[in-house]
């Protein structure tokens, strides 16, 4: 199994035979995993606020969730705090965030598309072992810049893979692996630029939650449905 980690979110090349794991640890992919664990049936990642409102008109009962600059979008039902996503049995979520939902849409060419985070790292690693494909871990970054927490998040998943299978790491994947092996998640997240920004905005509890390694046993898997990306709990994980 070959594993690569990207430094920045970018358009994927030659991913048709690979498993791609998109990470937006603070907070979109953590929120997606949390929403599915709380019973949400489907999550539609969208790039723009306008697209979110238009899609809501087509899906009866859907909830709008997301943020811009870390703050809940006016008119949305939910922000991007994973702590808001509780009691969602059977619900459909339309989610738009500054970074993560856009990166997910860049990865639709993958054979298998997964939303990964620290909270579901082991579930994602176990699923990747079942798939037995080469893997690209794709950090979302912050405003198109390198993101410490996403790069380390990839490393925690790699560490779990390395415990169970012989893996071949690219140079970037090796650096990610060593970063995660040497630093606990809570230290990475609180020291990161984006973590500090969220703490200053009043979301310290979010940062603490997003650092909880292996909290959730859920694998959010994306696929195209009528030309639109939708994320559901993987039916193949069990």
UniProtKB/Swiss-Prot annotation:
Q: Which cofactors is this protein said to need?
A: Mg(2+)
Any one Pfam family match given in the protein's UniProt record, by short name: 2-ph_phosp
Q: MF terms per GO, please?
A: 2-phosphosulfolactate phosphatase activity; magnesium ion binding; sulfopyruvate decarboxylase activity
Domain of life of the organism in this record?
Answer: Bacteria
Question: Which keywords does this chain's UniProt record carry?
Answer: Hydrolase, Magnesium
The reaction(s) annotated as catalysed by this protein in its Swiss-Prot or TrEMBL entry are:
(2R)-O-phospho-3-sulfolactate + H2O = (2R)-3-sulfolactate + phosphate
On whether Magnesium is a keyword of this UniProt record, the answer is yes
Q: Which HAMAP family match?
A: ComB
Q: What is this protein called?
A: Probable 2-phosphosulfolactate phosphatase
Which organism is the protein's source?
A: Carboxydothermus hydrogenoformans (strain ATCC BAA-161 / DSM 6008 / Z-2901)
Instruction: Tell me the lineage of the source organism.
Output: Bacteria, Bacillati, Bacillota, Clostridia, Thermoanaerobacterales
